[in-house]
Amino acid sequence: MQTAYWVMVMMMVWITAPLSEGGKLNNVIRGLVPDDVTPKRISQSLISRRRFDSRIMFVPSCIWKTCPSYLHGDNYDLKEKDK
């Protein structure tokens, strides 16, 4: 717990120190983020991950062992199937 406190204090000092030298908060925050991290790059990364995930087949979710009615015409109870 004590270590977490000091890490938090040091982070606050690291962020606010440039402000005491006349820097603007917006510039300080931008300095903490790498230049190649942009909204466009983040969205491209997410889209490329979705393409790889498309290989995974769709598995319908069943809540409390009852599947949605659109899968089987009426409620399909997994407990009855196991008997």
Swiss-Prot record:
Further comment: This peptide is an evolutionarily optimized stable analog of somatostatin. In addition, it adopts nearly identical conformations as in the somatostatin drug analog Octreotide. As this drug, it contains a D-Trp at the same position, whose synthesis is a common strategy used for enhancing the metabolic stability of compounds in drug design.
Taxonomic source organism: Conus raulsilvai
Tissue spec. comment: Expressed by the venom duct.
Record text about domains: The cysteine framework is C-C.
Cellular-component GO terms for this entry: extracellular region
Keyword vocabulary terms for this entry: D-amino acid, Disulfide bond, G-protein coupled receptor impairing toxin, Hydroxylation, Secreted, Signal, Toxin
Propeptide residues per the UniProt entry: 23-55, 71-83
Name of this protein: Consomatin Rs1
Signal sequence annotation: 1-22
Modified residues (4-hydroxyproline): 68
Disulfide linkage: 62-67
Organism lineage: Eukaryota, Metazoa, Spiralia, Lophotrochozoa, Mollusca
Modification D-tryptophan occurs at: 64
